[in-house]
Amino acid sequence: MTRLTHIDDQGRARMVDVSDKAETVREAIAVGFVRMTPETLALAITGAGRKGDVRAVAEIAGVMAAKKTADLIPLCHPLALSKVEVSVEVAEGGLAVMARVKLKGQTGVEMEALTAVSVACLTIYDMLKAAEKGMVIETVRLVEKTGGKSGAWRAE
């Protein structure tokens, strides 16, 4: 059975001690999607929404969120990230969000990538909610990670 690393032998939550782990280059990619009507998508594409350029603001929000992950997720380590790249692209039925996060360190950046995507999606919703309250944030997930003891992993 797999042991949960954030739970000690007494069942209490704890931050994992990474001091003995090797420093390696670690990277994670996460994705998400905000489904919306064609009319709302047109507002996002043209930047004609009431709050400005939806895609640009969401990308910046995602970068900021990745840097704040340790403040939002209780047992995450504060990390000196070397790269955070967030993109918001037009796709059929909505906006596709992707975050790529990288560092050289002792712990992975999966949570930073997932946090970046989640906050970018929430920002898209916030900026367009005046036009459509029924937007759906979906499929937020990790699609790839490299580095560290467990090595590379890719979603199927």
Swiss-Prot record:
Binding residues annotated for substrate, in chain numbering: 75-77, 111-112
Keyword Ribosomal protein applies: no
Catalytic reaction equation(s): (8S)-3',8-cyclo-7,8-dihydroguanosine 5'-triphosphate = cyclic pyranopterin phosphate + diphosphate
Classification via SUPFAM superfamilies: Molybdenum cofactor biosynthesis protein C, MoaC (SSF55040)
Family label: Belongs to the MoaC family.
Uppermost EC category: lyase
Entry-linked PANTHER family: CYCLIC PYRANOPTERIN MONOPHOSPHATE SYNTHASE (PTHR22960:SF29), MOLYBDOPTERIN COFACTOR SYNTHESIS PROTEIN A (PTHR22960)
Keywords in alphabetical order: Lyase, Molybdenum cofactor biosynthesis
Pfam family, one: MoaC
Organism from which the protein derives: Caulobacter sp. (strain K31)
GO molecular function annotations of the record: cyclic pyranopterin monophosphate synthase activity
Protein name in UniProt: Cyclic pyranopterin monophosphate synthase
Pathway annotation from the record: Cofactor biosynthesis; molybdopterin biosynthesis
InterPro entries: MoaC, MoaC_bact/euk, MoaC_sf, MoCo_biosynth_MoaA/MoaC, Mopterin_CF_biosynth-C_dom
EC number: 4.6.1.17
Subunit structure of this chain's protein: Homohexamer; trimer of dimers.
Top-level taxon in the UniProt lineage: Bacteria
Active site: 126
Example of a GO biological process term: Mo-molybdopterin cofactor biosynthetic process
Function per UniProt: Catalyzes the conversion of (8S)-3',8-cyclo-7,8-dihydroguanosine 5'-triphosphate to cyclic pyranopterin monophosphate (cPMP).
